[in-house]
């Protein structure tokens, strides 16, 4: 249930939009399986497979972006095209031109697509209307771009903004490595990546290794900066922070797992409990993370404008 990756975006806090309205916006873009000749397709799917495109509890919403893609290796297409081209050349007595080869390749692709394997992938989106977060559970930037693209297409004038904090995450992570500790209930774990900003970009990675202060100081004095840092929040959630503020490898720790509702009687009740627990914990963690990075610049601008 827990998101593994957090691509963060800001919404107005609070964002006064009801789940029913989101449902209406998403409905025209609901996922429809592709036909036999479509290479890929995408749309919104039901988080609970009950037909509803929005799952909502306590001003928290879950959406599911579904993408379907046919697997047709280029090597297979090229192999069949080459064989077909040889047959045609034997019949007509001369080699095919570039345009004819391109048209033949397109024809072969159309013939093979209906027999290609299909893969389907779901990507979850969490909307916190109370605190103004929109979070995409995607590790790859390209996948996040696809989800954002459909969100913007589905929701007219979506008030989506990037997260802007006062402190550079790279500078902050580098300082925390140098001091060996992070502020505000966060701790530094044993995975880190330091990279030189100079030509060549020399990189040092630590995985499951004690981050000794002398070693960190030596690398930082040599011009390297921290670009990935494993951390833990409040002994409850571990994660890896990146320069873009994308959070990866999110893992709830035992204290949270033990907080799961033992009275849940069925899948629906367990799902509701899990969503409430996850969104509550991650919401508090994100608030604390923004605080230790100097605060949200959007909030500062809004307060200045109001004054």
Swiss-Prot record:
Chief site of localization: cytoplasm
UniProt-listed InterPro entries: RdgC
Keywords from the named record: Cytoplasm, DNA recombination
Pfam assignment, any one: RdgC
Top-rank taxon, per record: Bacteria
UniProt GO BP: DNA recombination; regulation of DNA recombination
Cytoplasm found in the keyword field: yes
Subcellular location: Cytoplasm, Nucleoid
Gene Ontology CC terms, in alphabetical order: bacterial nucleoid; cytoplasm
Secretion signal, residue range per the UniProt entry: none
GO molecular function: double-stranded DNA binding
Family note: Belongs to the RdgC family.
HAMAP family: RdgC (MF_00194)
Function: May be involved in recombination.
Protein's recorded name: Recombination-associated protein RdgC
Organism the protein comes from: Ralstonia nicotianae (strain ATCC BAA-1114 / GMI1000) (Ralstonia solanacearum)
Gene name tied to this protein: rdgC
């Amino acid at each position: 249930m827990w998101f593994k990756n957090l691509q963060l975006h800001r919404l107005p806090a609070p964002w006064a939009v009801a789940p029913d309205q989101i449902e209406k916006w998403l409905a025209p873009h609901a996922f429809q399986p592709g036909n036999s000749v479509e290479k890929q397709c995408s749309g919104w799917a039901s988080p609970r497979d009950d037909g509803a495109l929005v799952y909502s509890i306590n001003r928290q919403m879950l959406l599911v972006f579904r993408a379907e893609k046919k697997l047709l290796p280029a090597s297979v297409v090229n192999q069949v095209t080459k064989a077909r081209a040889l047959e045609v050349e034997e019949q007509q007595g001369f080699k095919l031109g570039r345009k004819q080869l391109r048209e033949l390749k397109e024809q072969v692709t159309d013939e093979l697509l209906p027999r290609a394997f299909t893969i389907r992938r779901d990507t979850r989106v969490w909307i916190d209307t109370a605190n103004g977060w929109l979070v995409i559970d995607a590790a790859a930037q390209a996948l996040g771009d696809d989800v954002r693209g459909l969100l913007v297409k589905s929701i007219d004038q979506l008030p989506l903004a990037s997260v802007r904090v006062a402190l550079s995450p790279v500078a902050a992570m580098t300082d925390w490595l140098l001091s060996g500790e992070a502020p505000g209930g966060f701790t530094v774990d044993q995975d880190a990546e330091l990279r030189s900003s100079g030509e060549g970009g020399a990189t040092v990675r630590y995985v499951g290794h004690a981050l000794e202060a002398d070693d960190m100081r030596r690398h930082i004095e040599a011009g390297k900066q921290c670009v990935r840092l494993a951390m833990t929040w409040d002994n409850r959630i571990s994660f890896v922070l990146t320069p873009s503020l994308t959070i990866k490898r999110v893992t709830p720790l035992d204290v949270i797992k033990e907080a799961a509702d033992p009275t849940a009687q069925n899948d629906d009740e367990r799902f509701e409990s899990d969503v409430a627990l996850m969104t509550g914990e991650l919401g508090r963690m994100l608030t604390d993370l923004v605080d230790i990075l100097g605060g949200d610049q959007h909030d500062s601008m809004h307060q200045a404008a109001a004054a």
